Regions:
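Glycine-rich phosphate/ribose-binding loops and adjacent secondary-structure elements
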Residues: 151-210
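Conserved anion-binding
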Residues: 101, 105-141
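Glycine-rich beta-to-alpha transition loops that act as phosphate-gripper elements at the mouths
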Residues: 36, 57, 83-84, 146, ...
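An N-cap/entry alpha-helix motif that binds or orients negatively charged groups
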Residues: 1-16, 126-147
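N-terminal capping/small domains of soluble enzymes
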Residues: 1-99, 105
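Short, ordered loop/turn segments at secondary-structure junctions
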Residues: 58-59, 110-112, 168, 190-192
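Short, small-residue-enriched loops and turns at beta-alpha junctions
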Residues: 31-33, 85, 113-115, 141-142, ...
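A structural motif
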Residues: 50-51, 102, 160, 182
């Protein structure tokens, strides 16, 4: 108590990228399900903030269009991807992102298979059949069930961008990711929707810090 808090500064940096405050946008698929402008509307809404937006590989807008929309803003763009069973999908996505000016690659690690999410089965949206992924063919790609920490090293070999691994909840996994070449990790349990029985994210943060 009794500390001078009259001049609070929330600015920080992540992997050398300055941000106004330590809050960014996690990857969310198919923004056009929520609004016709999709990811472009999201960029417009946060373009005045100097923060990080992670674009989902299952975005409903071309990543090149998102990059153009963000180029005159203070927004830092990172591209999320998976290790797909056909590595060509991953390679192409990463290289397109790098060519478009993205500043980081986020690898989702907690999806070796596509989970059955019961709430998604129960819920239906009027436009879900009309909104498709723009950067990959959602009907052809599959997650790789054989992906390992070695794939972080492989991913690092095909890009100069920093690799951020998302979906780790233990200190042991965090250490393995860093040893494999990851520049950072994102502690995440995928909103509790991917792996049944996952601990809460704040528990994973504690283990990872240790």
């Amino acid at each position: 108590m009794l500390r001078d808090v009259s001049k609070n500064i929330l600015e920080t940096s992540t992997l050398g990228q300055k941000v106004d405050f330590p809050i960014g946008l996690s990857p969310v698929a198919l923004h056009k399900l929520a609004h016709p402008e999709g990811e472009l509307g999201t960029v417009a809404g946060i373009s005045s903030f100097r923060t990080i937006m992670i674009l989902s590989s299952f975005a409903s807008t071309l990543l090149e269009e998102v990059a153009v929309a963000a180029q005159n803003s203070s927004l830092h763009l990172w591209m999320q991807t998976y290790i797909f069973d056909n590595r060509t999908w991953t390679t192409t996505l990463v290289r397109r992102a790098e060519m478009s000016g993205f500043k980081g690659i986020v690898l989702t690690a907690d999806s070796p298979i596509d989970a059955t999410v019961t709430c998604n089965v129960r819920m239906s949206l009027e436009n879900e059949d009309q909104v498709l992924t723009a950067n990959i063919d959602q009907h052809k790609v599959k997650f790789s069930a054989s992906a390992t920490f070695k794939d972080i090293s492989w991913l690092k070999s095909i890009t100069k961008l920093p690799i951020i691994v998302k979906g780790l909840l233990s200190g042991e996994d965090a250490k393995l990711a860093i040893l494999a070449g990851a520049s950072a990790i994102l502690v995440s349990n995928h909103g509790g929707r991917q792996m049944d029985g996952d601990p809460a994210t704040h528990s994973g943060e504690k283990f990872s810090r240790e």
